[in-house]
Swiss-Prot record:
This is Hemoglobin subunit alpha. The modification Phosphothreonine is found at T8, T108, T134, T137. Involved in oxygen transport from the lung to the various peripheral tissues. Pfam families: Globin.
Length: 141
């Protein structure tokens, strides 16, 4: 459960990210593919070379979904229901991959915002990404 302090940290961080969310999403996805090569199996039709336009475009989709989640912190299941359906029923993404991407998102944000990435912000973002991952995998059962 996200506390009021977590919600404040998440919204504040997302405000600071601003127009870079799509870039950071692409970078985190790149980082995921490089660090955890098995994640590439879901994208056989993509050019997965670092910085590819397809990876950047999908990273923007990830960032857009997270921006939606930030705007609906009190109703993540409602805000992400369609995305949960897509990943569970059509794409059948292994749930562990959400954890791997979450880790890479944290690393990417820490690299770009080292001063703002305090232990409290880190913990809040980790809880947020875990909550989003939980929603996205909730329909697997």
């Amino acid at each position: 459960v996200l506390s009021p302090a977590d919600k404040t940290n998440i919204k504040s961080t997302w405000d600071k990210i601003g127009g870079h969310a799509g870039d950071y999403g692409g970078e985190a996805l790149d980082r995921t593919f490089q660090s955890f090569p098995t994640t590439k199996t879901y994208f056989p039709h993509f050019d997965l070379s670092p910085g590819s336009a397809q990876v950047k475009a999908h990273g923007k989709k990830v960032a857009d979904a997270l921006t939606t989640a930030v705007a609906h912190l009190d109703d993540l299941p409602g805000a992400l229901s369609a995305l949960s359906d897509l990943h569970a029923y059509k794409l059948r993404v292994d749930p562990v991959n959400f954890k791997l991407l979450s880790h890479c998102l944290l690393v990417t944000l820490a690299c770009h915002h080292p001063t703002e990435f305090t232990p409290a912000v880190h913990a809040s973002l980790d809880k947020f990404f875990t909550a989003v991952s939980t929603v996205l995998t909730s329909k697997y059962r």
